[in-house]
Amino acid sequence: LVSDARRDYFLNQQNGQASTHILDSSTLPAKDLEVRGIVWLPRMMPKAIAKLRGELPPETMYGCGGDRRFFKANNIHPAEFLRATWAYEDEPEKLIDWVTTRRGS
């Protein structure tokens, strides 16, 4: 499912053109940062965008232990978060609202 989201983004948003940019993992927000009381969300958002764009470096894993804790705590599947990130790519507040809603479900 995660690969399907990435493939769909690649074909529909990137028109089949690979990005030449690679995320610098040292620029990711700290692991203990939170927004609206949701730990890891500030870090998760740029990771998901980089995953969608094919810009994650080999040393950075989408779905690592911290990501899995985030997904479990907020009742979200990893592929579902990618699709929501895509839907709200230019509206981070709406993505935060979506996570907040999922957290309560």
Whereabouts are the PLM-identified features?
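Polar/charged low-complexity regulatory segments
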Residues: 1-57, 105
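Amphipathic alpha-helical packing elements
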Residues: 56-99
